[in-house]
UniProtKB/Swiss-Prot annotation:
Name of protein: Probable galacturonosyltransferase 7
Lumenal topological domain: 41-619
Glycosylation positions in this chain: N68, N106, N132, N343, N421
InterPro entries: GAUT, Glyco_trans_8, Nucleotide-diphossugar_trans
């Protein structure tokens, strides 16, 4: 009996389960029929404000329905762009006052950042200081014209994004889009009034006319960005829209609703403008930091040619370690840039056979660099190419690091900033520079040249300088002083001291070894690495501390900096300078380089090599 009762209960439970399954299936069938109907009837648009126009998505000028629906997506894209820009920027210290430009923004965090075009630099906020002596007041008249007292947008852009804003201002092309702008304005007003008119049952004809005009304008604007793209009879469409808007304004409407819609349009427009600005900055930085295709082709062709040639090893030359000769050191991964530096130096030398050039590069570019100088010898001078990653030095970081550049921006509201450029670039020694005393242990004095310089005078007199016991002979820049760099919070600095620059440096290696400069730098770097500051910020502070009171100031005419970001350098100052330094992002071998300064660089480029034409190298 117990068994039978149990069986009966199990049968009842089974029937109940079947009923539940049947009901579930019926519900699913009903839903599968109702949901498509709901979409067909437009019920899915119920979350929109009443009266909003729904049209096919085509452009950024679509109806509010489309913009609201895509607002979250666009913000997601903007956030992704921000994330990419942050990856390009160096990770700067949270506790210091260094701010990140858009690496304007060295595009990678880490000690061994390289400058293909040039990695973008960390931004250092500074206060105003006296103008650079090499630039006359007249050279800034162009800036004064562009930065009027009421134009804060341009100033804010330059502080935030650095040289991108300088480049944009100089390369901005006027657009003939007066009618396009007029159409946009009318479209915005029509969108603002449409919801109120749509609520009036007696104005169904006006509602239809407004809707048709809005959709027509959206379609035209989705295909046109300037007046030349507009279809014929656009003037009639403008008059028709103007008449519709005038009629809509004649009715009593809720002003709060119109105000709300106009504010929504303003917010969306500002978001869109901000998104496109960030996108433009990202593309600018990508162009700056990425090796041009032609230069990559040249490097690959030279590498292949090197391994196809018979002699793969250079004969050991006694000149490489002869202290009686004049030795130059160039740290670079750019073949053309290194070639221009050497060619321009040799051309202006009184006796080039005494010149020895040591080019330090990485393993990736070593064979191409070597093959280039075999194919293109530099008169009677000697060139040695060294692979820094294969050199055997104890307890040393053997990765190539180029001169570190830092972008300095003045805060808004400064009197100086309203008259001169708000952006400056400082270049200092990198980790690789502190290896030179070990690499060239038999030499007593060398001249270090950055790969973004062009020589215009004989540099032989630099070896006759009495540096008064100093280690580093460099041109000082008083445009920015140490006390103005908010990032320098450690160590005892002379706040009124001018900053020294790399680019042209006369280094007394014997004095360097005697004072243990490399060891001092490593000590400072290690002490400062205990915090959360970035490697770039640490390197800046460590370098300035290391060479404090050890810099011999060269005459300003030895080197002129700023040709990689400043459009308004005095022509006479360029003519008088012994060395032109293209510090900044707009390097002369890039398409973004400043056109007026490119000729000084191009004239020293060896154009006879067939690989240049094969790879379409024409900077």
């Amino acid at each position: 009996m117990k068994g039978g009762g149990g069986g009966g209960g199990g049968g009842g439970g089974g029937k109940r389960r079947w009923k539940v399954l049947v009901i579930g299936v019926l519900v699913l069938v009903i839903l599968s029929m109702l949901v498509p109907l709901a979409f067909l009837l437009g019920l899915h648009n119920g979350f929109h404000s009443p009266g909003f126009v729904t049209v096919q998505p085509a452009s950024s000028f679509e109806s509010f329905t489309r913009i609201n629906a895509t607002k979250h997506t666009q913000r997601d894209v903007s956030e992704r762009v921000d994330e990419v820009l942050q990856k390009i920027n160096p990770v700067l210290p949270k506790k210091s006052d260094i701010n990140v430009g858009s690496r304007d923004v060295n595009a990678t965090s880490g000690t061994d950042s390289k400058k293909r075009g040039l990695p973008v630099s960390p931004t250092v906020v500074a206060n105003p200081s006296p103008a650079n002596k090499t630039k006359s007041e007249a050279s800034y008249t162009g800036v004064q014209r562009k930065i009027v007292s009421g134009d804060e947008t341009w100033r804010t852009c330059e502080v935030k994004y650095g040289s991108y804003c300088l480049w944009r201002e100089e390369n901005k092309e006027p657009m003939k889009d007066a009618k396009v702008k007029q159409m946009k304005d009318q479209l915005f007003v029509a969108r603002a009034y449409y919801p109120s008119i749509a609520k009036m049952p007696s104005q169904s004809k006006l509602t239809r006319d407004m809707k048709q005009n809005i959709q027509e304008f959206e379609r035209i604007l989705s295909e046109s960005s300037q007046d030349a793209d507009l279809p014929p009879q656009v003037d009639k469409k403008l008059q028709k829209m103007e008449a519709v808007i005038a009629k809509a304004k004649s009715f009593p409407v809720d002003c709060n609703n119109v105000d709300k819609k106009l504010r929504q349009i303003l917010d969306l427009t500002e978001d869109e403008a901000s998104f496109h600005m960030k996108q433009s900055v990202f593309l600018y930085q990508l162009a700056v930091q990425t090796m041009p295709k032609s230069l990559h082709c040249l490097s690959m062709r030279l590498t292949v040619e090197h391994f196809k040639s018979d002699s793969l090893e250079d004969p050991i030359s006694e000149k490489f370690s002869d202290p009686s000769l004049l030795h130059f050191v160039i740290i670079s991964d750019n073949i053309l840039a290194s070639s221009v530096v050497i060619n321009s130096t040799v051309v202006h030398a009184r006796d080039s056979k005494n010149f020895v050039f040591h080019v330090l590069t990485d393993e990736q570019n070593y064979f191409a660099m070597k093959q280039w100088f075999i194919r293109n010898p530099c008169k009677q001078s000697t060139v040695q190419v060294l692979n820094i990653e294969k050199l055997e030095l104890d307890d040393s970081d053997m990765k190539l690091s180029l001169s570190a550049e830092f972008r300095v921006s003045f805060p808004s509201g400064d009197l100086l900033a309203s008259q001169q450029n708000r952006t400056h670039y400082l270049s200092l020694f990198s980790q690789s520079h502190y290896l030179l005393p070990k690499l060239f242990d038999k030499l007593e004095k060398v001249v270090i040249l950055d790969d973004d310089v062009v020589v215009q005078r004989d540099l032989s007199p630099l070896w006759d300088l009495d540096m008064e016991g100093k280690v580093n002979g460099a041109v000082k820049s008083c445009t920015v002083r140490l006390g103005q760099l908010r990032s320098l919070k450690r160590g005892n600095f002379d706040t009124n001291a001018c900053l020294w620059m790399s680019g042209l440096n006369v280094v007394d290696l014997a004095r360097w070894r005697a004072l243990g400069v490399s060891e001092t730098y490593q000590k400072y770097y290690k002490e400062m690495s205990s915090g959360d500051e970035s490697s770039e910020a640490i390197a800046l502070q460590a370098s300035l501390l290391t060479f404090q009171d050890q810099v011999y100031a060269l005459d300003d005419k030895w080197a002129l900096s700023g040709l990689g970001y400043d459009y308004y350098i005095n022509a006479q100052a360029i003519k008088n300078a012994a060395i032109l330094h293209y510090n900044g992002n707009m390097k002369p071998w890039l398409e973004l380089g400043i056109p007026n300064y490119k000729n000084y660089w191009r004239r020293h480029l060896s154009r006879e090599d067939r690989f240049l034409s094969d790879c379409n190298v024409n900077p």
